[in-house]
Amino acid sequence: HKKLGRLMWDYVGMARNEQGLKFVYEEIQTLKDLFYNDINIPGTQTFNPELEKAGRLGDFLELGQLMALDALDRNESCGGHFREEYQTEENEAKRNDDDYAYVSAWEYNQDINKSQLHKENLDFKEVKLTSRSYK
């Protein structure tokens, strides 16, 4: 879990880039392969807190990889998610409201590579979309 946490912190944090996201996606896949192929859970067949911890780690591995996939899919900077490739000359976030004005949810299909992105477009009637400057 520490390795996963470090990978997420280093590559899927607030500032990220395509190269790092692709790297972390593959690194998490390697961790998942190790985890699912070499897992050894101590304990008995009664209540086993180690089994519970292993289940949570499996979930965290899947979620971390999905977060990297989602960040790769979003080719813009927006809010607290800064893609280094998408910034203005003043190093401000460069949004792409034409392509990314939606809310989304990923459907997991037992394999991260078969996950399906569902989108619901946002219709701004009362508010006009504008970019903010933090300078």
Residue ranges and their predicted role:
Residues H1-K135:
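Glycine- and aromatic-enriched mobile tails/lids
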